[in-house]
């Protein structure tokens, strides 16, 4: 699989300069309207979004592989329906359901990455302990608990993981796990009826936030903030939340970005988060390898475990696909 990614990435595909709505003044006005609604008791949180537009010089399939090479992992998907090409690089799990156990993993809370190890660790710790981001995260956890309760056996809704922070090539993200055992007789349509759209891309209360979004965002979001996934033989289903997802049509692309706005948010902070999330579109880097030098003595690598650990740190920092057993077998 990695070799296929390399082959497509090497072909190359570039995107022309972007057009963004809103500009900063429009964003500030939109932010103020949301905060006014929160202060008026209408809402607790709104996930506000807007599109970035551009022209694609090259093939959508090649661009997808370049994006995927720049940020491996997550829940990526490529769909071509004959008119539109959907390039989803989502890091967020909407749900996984095996017919009995239902897992959701809402993602709320973002911080930038840094090439400096100490600064990078500080950003991670700052996100993990941020009162604003924790409040935003727990609001959506409570919303998902309520949504899951519509499907769940009594007393089966659980939060086994709260405020986990995971590193991606361009950002740190905070997630929590919400699980439930579903009642007998539920099917996939019931799961979507109860959960869709994911609360992490609407806000809370969910219906009121969706009404606010419809009234204030200039156009429908399309596939962005929807769900893309797979249903396996036997019925097990995994779907992402279609964030970091671009739609290409006739050589032009559109990609939405946004953030959750609460009473504790600031316009400067949310604007910076929007800008930081757009960095993933620049992660269309050329393929590269990690070079490690080591000493062989009598056919054995000296300090092999230390070398493997160093290679793994480099791979994870650079977003390079890492399979420990394959590397160890090669040594």
What is the predicted role of each segment?
Residues 314-327:
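Extracellular glycan-recognition regions
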Residues 1-298, 305-307, 315-318:
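Extended alpha-helical targeting/anchoring segments
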Residues 217-218, 326-331:
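A long amphipathic alpha-helix within ATP-dependent nucleotide-binding catalytic cores
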